[in-house]
Amino acid sequence: PFDAPGVIKGQGTIGTEINRQLKDIHAVFVPVGGGGLISGVAAYFTQVAPHTKIIGVEPYGAASMTLSLYEGHRVKLENVDTFADGVAVALVGEYTFAKCQELIDGMVLVRNDGISAAIKDVYDEGRNILETSGAVAIAGAAAYCEFYNIKNENIVAIASGANMDFSKLHKVTELAELGSDNEALLATFMIEQPGSFKTFAKLVGSMNITEVTYRFTSERKEALVLYRVDVDEKSDLEEMIKKLNSSNMKTFNFSHNELVAEHIKHLVGGSASISDEIFGEFIFPEKAGTLSTFLEAFSPRWNITLCRYRDQGDINGNVLVGFQVPQSEMDEFKSQADGLGYPYELDNSNEAFNIVVAE
C-alpha cells in the first residue's frame, strides 16, 4: 500500500499538521519503511517550505532505501532486521523510490541501541513508551544533530507506529543505556588467584557496576568478567580501562557490539578450544517447533557446540549457533543451511568470538 499515490497523499497531510504547529523548521526526520510517509511529507514541504530539509531514517539492518539511493536503483535486501518491524521492508516502492530520489535531502542510519535509547528519552521526558519503529526518527534526529553540532534550531521527528510489544521491553531496556552511552559493556580477563576479583573491584573504583558475570576459565588459568558500569564521563571510563590494562587485566569495550549484548554476555562457561568450529546467526519465525526443526537439519551430521536463543517479541527470532564443520564439508554444510530457507550469516570475524567464546 505504501507505493500508491493516494496513500502517499494521505500520509503527506502529516506535513500539513507539522507546518500548522511550527514554522521555520530546520529539518524533519521521517522513519522510512517502504517510503510512502517520507514521499508524502517531502512533497508537501517542497511546495510550502522548500528550505526545510527532509531526512529519512532507517535501522542499519533494514536500510533498503538508503542502499537503493546509493546504488541509484531499487535494491532488495536479502536479510532484514525486524527489531523495528514497522520499517522492516526488504524492497522499497517503485514510485516512492523515484520520489525520494527527487525530493529528500538525505538518509540517516541508526543502530538498535540508538533506537532503544530514543525510547528511553521519550519515556523520561513525557512518560510515553514508543514502539521501536516509532522511535527510529527520534534516534536519527539525535544522531544527526550531535554529528553536525546543530543547536538552537527547530527540529521535528515523526513518531509513527502503534504501541510497544510488551515482550520486547526487556530487550529495549537492555540496549537503551548502552545506546545513550550511560552504560558500558566490558570484558576483563584476570589471572585467577585468591584476591584477584577483589583487586578488580578496587580498580573499577567509584564507577557503579550494574551487572556482572564472573567465570573461571581453567584452560587459560584466567577468570573472565563480563560486566556493565554506569558512565557519567567518557574520560572516567577510558581511565578505568587504562588502569585495568596496566594492571595485567586485559579489558575490552563491547558497548556497541550487539552480538555481545544479545548473546555472548549470557555464555558464562568461558572459552573452548574446538577444532573446525564456526559460528552463525540464523533468523527464523518465532513459532512453536521452529527451533527443533532448525536443529534437526544439522544434528547429528555436524556437532552443535553452542546455542543461544531467546524469544524477543519480534516477528523473527535470532539464534547464535556454533558447529564443528571440517573445511572439506563446508560446501555441504552451506547447502544444507540454504535449504532451510532462513536468513543466516556465518561470521567468525567478530572479535568477541575469539576473545570470549573461542580459544
UniProtKB/Swiss-Prot annotation:
Reactions it catalyzes: L-threonine = 2-oxobutanoate + NH4(+)
GO MF annotation terms: pyridoxal phosphate binding; threonine deaminase activity
Gene3D superfamilies on file: 3.40.50.1100, Biosynthetic Threonine Deaminase, Domain 3 (3.40.1020.10)
Cofactor: pyridoxal 5'-phosphate
GO terms of biological process kind: isoleucine biosynthetic process; response to abscisic acid; response to jasmonic acid; response to wounding
Protein's UniProt keywords contain Amino-acid biosynthesis: yes
Metabolic or biological pathway: Amino-acid biosynthesis; L-isoleucine biosynthesis; 2-oxobutanoate from L-threonine: step 1/1
ACT-like domain ranges (all copies): 184-256, 278-349
Location(s), subcellular: Plastid, Chloroplast
Tissues showing expression: Floral buds of untreated plants. After ABA treatment or mechanical wounding is mostly accumulated in leaves, to a lesser extent in stems, but not in roots. Expressed in anthers, carpel leaves, pith cells, sepals and petals. Not expressed in stomium, vascular bundles, epidermal cells or pollen mother cells.
Similarity section: Belongs to the serine/threonine dehydratase family.
Self-association and partners: Homotetramer.
Protein name: Threonine dehydratase biosynthetic, chloroplastic
Species, as recorded: Solanum tuberosum
Lineage of the organism: Eukaryota, Viridiplantae, Streptophyta, Embryophyta, Tracheophyta
Gene: TD
